[in-house]
């Protein structure tokens, strides 16, 4: 895989975000350093798979950001797009228009306003009462002007070799363990699960109910979680890390990658991913709410964005 990835690397010289190139490593530059990224939908390297990919990323001279649209559980679509893709596109559009020194409050305010515009365009749906219908995403970004890393939800980063915000949601942990228990109790093979994941089928009502805890300060504290969905997030739930100087290396990755590799480059991420996928395609050894479905190339979309200072 390493040689193929190296051979397929795209070199850009725009110094600013352009349309995403899927399925192959991309290198680029901004004023302060080098950019490398990779993104692929779980459906694989096809136009349809790329159009459905709910992970996204953005970079320019002022920000690096990565966002992960949540897998839809409602069955709803909007102009042919699932909620996770809608969330990805809303966030990307906002980052393209941000002023260089935008504060975290400004970023979130602009995102929420874009969401409200979207909700207004769909008056037949009550997004306040039915959180399951809300296009949802996690988001993490670094502001070069403010020298701060901001995370909403369980988005993760590694900064100068130190893992940040790797803690998972309790509701996800509980549902992941229950899914695996069902699979083991029914003695399902990996082939069985790939064709018909009865473990996920069993927990799907819980996944739908889980949205009642999303951005809901009235929910039991243990089950609360916070995400981008157009509704307010308490200031104390916005995670912020500040730095005296811009880090030498910033790695942002979605949960399509299980962990951080030894090296800080796309090839290392992809090599670790391939190994993990081979060893545990149905996410049983490392429990998750979903595994590798028949016809897909991964259990989830995946994206990684790496910045290296000059």
Q: What spans do the regions from the language model cover?
A:
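Classical Sec-dependent N-terminal signal peptides that target proteins to the secretory pathway
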Residues: 1-19
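PP2C/PPM-type serine/threonine phosphatase catalytic domain
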Residues: 19-310
